């Protein structure tokens, strides 16, 4: 099953590639308020149905064999800034999804619907309201929390044994203006666990307090079991734009590998947090700038968490375009390796204004701007050993890494390149074994399946406008 960036859904024959059926999304023709490109990150499958999220805020259920629309619900209104870009999760008769739109001033949420008829079952707000856990991490003298972001870009993961779902959240809003939202701004830039049946909060871990850099957590969480410190632990890993892997106990939310709170540089006009979490182990991407670009002066050596304010740009690395972004990571349960596609991209940050006003619904709500620093922008593909949070290997590419990866039991890991190459690497060493040029940007994750005793690899290549890959 394939879904396009415009939400048309196709069923293809695994034997011939022929189209068996197709569903036209018929998006609202007035649709305008989309952040970060027309895209869909897949469909959900369960109970003989395909579940697809639409950019205009609908969820539709289709017959898996026929493509016939079985039900459709308006889960959120695009006119208010919401869109649906993740693949819905089917679990135990429910369809569970998050929503995009933090850059357009929405209040993040996750919803569960009945898979039979689309009836709403529960809602969890990722920005807590008055009287809810975490509301005190937002200002009490304004209503900025109502537009606080923390949207959920990717499909939640589920542990059926524990009955929990897990997801990571986006930036607080406005993105680059901390002056109007003093506090840690929960549950933005966080990993959150909920009870799947009820949506009840279980635990959270915040990766970035009071984020002013758009260092959110768009990469989907990965669940794993591994021996750490002499016993098998139920683990969870998430790789942020910070360039770190955050490795937690998925039962409790506590770090499995140490994470220290360290003091960071301060800028009172941005109400910056006093400390930030620093995971022990290796960063996947550089977190400082070696040499200032011509015509620029570096503040704090351009290190991660360097604050900024006003119209004079401040260079810091990584930027919101660096670290790990939307393309999903993959996990090898034999080697205990997490394979991560990331980018080494520094940014030039501008923002922070106490007089910032909330724009009307559906308009961009960022409170600043970040451009590319005049430095090389390169890609990194790496293997992280989840038992130690250290790099097993890492390779740098001349172009940004923007592709989901696939780990296989045969000791191969597959990843795409922006110029259209599908690359097979040795899982142990990262050495390239073979490549195939697909003709368009290989940005979607590769899929594998077995048919008649033979294993196949399927690659969807179409390019990506946001990253500027071949189309």
Model-derived features: where do they sit?
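Residue position within the beta-strands of beta-propeller blades
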Residues: 2, 52, 96-97, 167, ...
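Loop/turn-rich, solvent-exposed surfaces of beta-rich toroidal or solenoidal domains
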Residues: 225, 342-344, 373-431
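Extracytoplasmic beta-rich repeat domains
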Residues: 19-44, 69-87, 104, 125-157, ...
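Structural signal for beta-propeller blades
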Residues: 9-10, 59, 110, 191, ...
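Blade-level signature of beta-propeller repeat domains, shared across WD40, Kelch, NHL, RCC1
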Residues: 444-471
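Short coil/turn segments that connect the beta-strands within blades of beta-propeller domains
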Residues: 47-48, 92-94, 161-163, 233-234, ...
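Beta-propeller blade signature
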Residues: 62, 66, 108-120, 181-199, ...
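A detector of repeated loop/turn-to-beta-strand junctions in beta-rich toroidal repeat architectures
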Residues: 6, 56, 106-109, 187-188, ...
């Amino acid at each position: 099953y394939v879904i396009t960036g415009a939400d048309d859904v196709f069923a293809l024959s695994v034997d011939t590639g022929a189209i068996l059926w197709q569903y036209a999304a018929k998006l609202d023709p007035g649709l305008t308020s989309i952040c970060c490109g027309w895209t869909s990150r897949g469909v959900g499958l369960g109970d003989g149905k395909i579940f697809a999220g639409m950019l205009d805020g609908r969820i539709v259920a289709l017959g898996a064999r026929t493509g016939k629309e079985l039900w459709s619900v308006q889960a959120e209104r695009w006119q208010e800034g919401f869109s649906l870009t993740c693949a819905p999760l089917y679990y135990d008769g429910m369809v569970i999804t998050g929503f995009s739109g933090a850059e357009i001033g929405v209040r993040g949420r996750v919803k569960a619907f009945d898979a039979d008829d689309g009836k709403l079952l529960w809602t969890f707000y990722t920005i807590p309201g008055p009287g809810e856990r975490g509301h005190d991490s937002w200002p009490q003298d304004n209503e900025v929390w109502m537009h606080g972001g923390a949207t959920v870009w990717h499909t939640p993961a589920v542990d059926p044994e524990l009955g929990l779902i897990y997801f990571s959240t986006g930036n607080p809003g406005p993105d680059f203006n901390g002056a109007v939202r003093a506090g840690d701004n929960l549950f933005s830039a966080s990993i959150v666990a909920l009870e799947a049946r009820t949506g009840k909060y279980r635990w959270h871990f915040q990766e970035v307090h009071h984020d002013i850099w758009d260092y959110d957590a768009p990469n989907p969480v990965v669940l794993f079991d591994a021996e750490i410190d002499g016993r098998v632990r139920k683990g969870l890993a998430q790789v942020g734009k910070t360039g770190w892997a955050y490795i937690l106990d998925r039962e409790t939310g506590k770090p499995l590998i140490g994470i220290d709170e360290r003091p960071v540089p301060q800028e009172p006009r941005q109400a910056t947090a006093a400390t930030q979490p620093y995971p022990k182990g290796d960063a996947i991407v550089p977190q400082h700038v070696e040499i200032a670009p011509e015509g620029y002066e570096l503040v704090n050596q351009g290190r991660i968490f360097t604050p900024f304010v006003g119209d004079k740009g401040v260079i810091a690395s990584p930027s919101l375009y660096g670290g790990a972004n939307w393309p999903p990571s993959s996990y090898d349960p034999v080697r205990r390796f997490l394979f991560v596609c990331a980018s080494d991209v520094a940014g030039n940050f501008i923002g922070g204004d106490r007089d910032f006003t909330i724009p009307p619904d559906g308009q961009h709500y960022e409170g600043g701007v970040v451009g590319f620093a005049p430095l090389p922008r390169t890609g990194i593909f790496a293997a992280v050993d989840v038992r130690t949070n250290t790099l097993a290997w890492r390779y740098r590419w001349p172009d940004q890494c923007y592709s989901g990866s696939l780990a296989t039991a045969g000791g191969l890991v597959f990843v795409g390149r922006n110029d259209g190459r599908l690359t097979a690497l040795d899982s142990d060493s990262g050495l390239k074994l073979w490549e195939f040029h697909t003709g368009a940007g290989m940005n979607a994750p590769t899929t594998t399946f077995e048919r008649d005793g033979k294993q196949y690899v399927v690659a969807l290549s179409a390019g990506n406008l946001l990253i500027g890959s071949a189309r």
